[in-house]
């Protein structure tokens, strides 16, 4: 990979915390992270490296920060106090501020099914353990419609309603 044109100070624009430089890519932050099992997986350590290396274009195209479910488990797990959840929020803010037309795929997923992550693998695991199926708003058409109507009143969805039409 050629880093000659990367912005070595990009980290200051996105997440101006010296703690970011302490990340040694151990992966402990994804321990217990529900989004780390998503498709694609949210791997905070990869995002931290991309920020440090100044990979601006790659970060613009990255949708995984939007799959974070805000559980903050990464904050508890990080041995270097990098504050991965704050990094995720800062990256989302930077992406939105630099591209007002950006509609993360997670928003489309939230509209269609009420949550950002597919739970297929979790459901298979639950079945293998003899646990009941989790309730899902997608199986409650009236509630899903109410939820979608509510979301349609938000600017990001109402101004881009073509993305949320029924297929």
Features from the language model and the residues they span:
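Non-ligating segments of multi-cofactor redox enzymes
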Residues: 1-22, 28-32, 40-49, 53-56, ...
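Inter-heme linker and motif-flanking segments adjacent to c-type heme-binding CXXCH motifs
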Residues: 59
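Cysteine-centered iron-sulfur cluster-binding motifs in ferredoxin-type domains/subunits
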Residues: 19-36, 62-82
């Amino acid at each position: 990979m050629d880093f000659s044109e990367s912005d070595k100070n990009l980290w200051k624009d996105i997440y101006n915390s010296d703690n970011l430089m302490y990340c040694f890519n151990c992966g402990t932050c994804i321990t217990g992270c529900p989004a780390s099992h998503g498709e694609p997986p949210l791997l905070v350590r990869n995002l931290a490296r991309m920020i440090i290396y100044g990979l601006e274009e790659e970060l613009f195209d990255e949708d995984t920060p939007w799959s974070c479910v805000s559980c903050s488990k990464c904050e508890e797990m990080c041995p270097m106090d990098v504050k991965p959840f704050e990094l995720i929020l800062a990256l989302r803010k930077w992406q939105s501020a630099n591209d007002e037309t950006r509609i993360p795929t997670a928003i489309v997923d939230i509209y269609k099914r009420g949550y950002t992550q597919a739970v297929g693998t979790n459901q298979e695991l639950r079945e293998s353990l003899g646990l009941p199926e989790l309730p899902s708003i997608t199986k409650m058409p009236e509630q899903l419609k109410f939820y979608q109507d509510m979301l349609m009143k938000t600017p990001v969805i109402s101004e881009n309603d073509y993305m949320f039409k029924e297929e």
